[in-house]
């Protein structure tokens, strides 16, 4: 949303107003806890608030209390035309019936990359919301 601001009789300048979430923090955490981890990488692009919440131990604790635990496997792939490897989450859809042999119940979902250099990735482990 933008609001006009007039300055000395000239054309009005447009000042952008920051949008903020109107939901209380606890409600937002509860809502995100009900969303599948498959969608977290997309949600992290929406707002900075989502990025920090998705990476927070608080969200994973809430998911655990709600019984919304999802197993996933992190996969690191290096493509020939890219200088750095890319991270994906192997998401296994539970309770899916495969209609034919061409379809697959599993998805590789892109995951935001780790900020350290690939040389330090000799051994990594994911615990809750963190990758070490």
Curated annotation (Swiss-Prot):
InterPro entries: F-box/kelch-repeat_ARATH, F-box_dom. Residues 17-63 form the F-box domain. It comes from the Eukaryota. Pfam families: F-box (PF00646). This is Putative F-box protein At4g05620. The lineage of its organism: Eukaryota, Viridiplantae, Streptophyta, Embryophyta, Tracheophyta.
């Amino acid at each position: 949303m933008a609001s006009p601001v007039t300055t000395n009789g000239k054309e009005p300048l447009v000042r952008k107003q920051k949008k903020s979430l109107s939901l209380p923090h606890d409600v937002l955490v509860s809502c995100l806890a009900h969303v599948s981890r498959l969608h977290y990488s997309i949600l992290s692009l929406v707002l900075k608030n989502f990025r920090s919440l998705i990476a927070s131990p608080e969200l994973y604790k809430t998911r655990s209390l709600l019984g919304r635990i999802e197993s996933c496997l992190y996969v690191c792939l290096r493509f020939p035309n890219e200088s750095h490897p890319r991270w994906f989450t192997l998401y296994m859809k539970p309770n899916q019936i495969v209609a034919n042999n061409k379809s697959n119940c599993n998805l590789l979902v892109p995951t935001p990359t780790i900020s350290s250099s690939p040389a330090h990735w000799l051994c990594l482990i994911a615990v809750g919301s963190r990758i070490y």
